[in-house]
Curated annotation (Swiss-Prot):
One of its GO terms (cellular component) is bacterial-type flagellum stator complex. This is Motility protein B. GO terms for biological process: bacterial-type flagellum-dependent cell motility; chemotaxis. It comes from Bacillus subtilis (strain 168). NCBIfam families: PRK07734.1. Pfam families: MotB_plug (PF13677), OmpA (PF00691). SUPFAM superfamilies: OmpA-like. The gene is motB. It is a single-pass type II membrane protein. Keywords: Cell membrane, Chemotaxis, Flagellar rotation, Membrane, Transmembrane, Transmembrane helix. PROSITE patterns: OMPA_2. MotA and MotB comprise the stator element of the flagellar motor complex. Required for the rotation of the flagellar motor. Might be a linker that fastens the torque-generating machinery to the cell wall.
């Protein structure tokens, strides 16, 4: 009887040798990602050292990381600077245009005041001057006040109201009213000093101006300087006459209300 051969069943063997290089590749990729991530938060010197170490460990020599830099490329840095420069230039041009428009508006107000002075034949009582602080309108005290008094004469109230119309500007500007005197001691019981007199003249004149419903009282302020800001010598009658005055300063837009003359 023939002997029945026993069937051999051999287990199939799967070749897994590819796993070793695959694992090495994953390790290298992980190391590369770690380096790239770390490079964003370390300085250039440390990055070069770390790069060199990884290249020596994994490749045994010079690699692509040896001469990399964490600083932005030169052309990228230039682009950022160019954008910043362009923005600053636009801002500068905008401010220059606003300043030019502001100056033009003040010049227009000055022209209107000068026309008013000419029409009213007040060349010896009022004058205008453009200064670095704004448009200055100077009014001699004799046009509104009696000597040593701070109340505007009744007959001159209409003139003060006409002047108020010249100050109607849209949008409103800050306006400072200041009183000034000569250095002659005041000789009445109403005021303790020239300083007190100058303050009250400024306040009373300002009060008449802001009775104009077209003017905003919030943009007005009053000051008194007494004899301490003369524009002429107090040694002559003519000089003292020039020093006795009320000034209206129309400020540039954006100027502080506390702007000192």
């Amino acid at each position: 009887m023939a002997r029945k051969k026993k069937k051999k069943h051999e287990d199939e063997h799967v070749d897994e040798s590819w796993l070793v290089p695959y694992a090495d590749i994953l390790t290298l990729l992980l190391a590369l990602f770690i380096v790239l991530y770390a490079s964003s938060s370390i300085d250039a010197a440390k990055f070069q050292m770390l790069s060199k170490s990884f290249n020596e460990v994994f490749t045994g020599g010079t690699g692509v990381l040896d001469y990399s830099s964490v600083t932005p490329p030169e052309n990228e840095s230039d682009g950022i600077d160019e954008v910043k420069k362009e923005k600053e230039e636009k801002e500068k041009n905008k401010k220059e245009k606003e300043k030019a428009a502001d100056q033009e508006e003040l010049e227009n107000v000055k022209s209107q005041v000068e026309k008013f002075i000419k029409d009213k034949k007040l060349e010896h009582q009022l004058e205008t001057k453009m200064t670095s602080e704004g448009l200055l309108i100077t009014i001699k005290d004799s046009i509104f006040f009696d000597s040593g008094k701070a109340t505007i004469r009744k007959e001159d109230v209409p003139l003060a109201k006409e002047i108020s119309n010249l100050l109607v500007i849209n949008p409103p500007r800050n306006i400072i009213i200041s009183g000034h005197t000569d250095n002659m001691p005041i000789k009445n019981s109403e005021f303790q000093s020239n300083w007190h007199l100058s303050v009250m003249r400024a306040v009373n004149f300002m009060g008449l101006l802001i009775e104009n419903p077209k003017l905003d009282a919030k943009v007005f302020s009053a000051k008194g300087y007494g004899e301490y800001k003369p524009v002429a010598s107090n040694k002559t009658a003519e000089g003292r006459s020039k020093n006795r005055r009320v000034e209206v300063l129309i400020l540039p837009r954006g100027a502080a209300e506390t702007n000192e003359k």
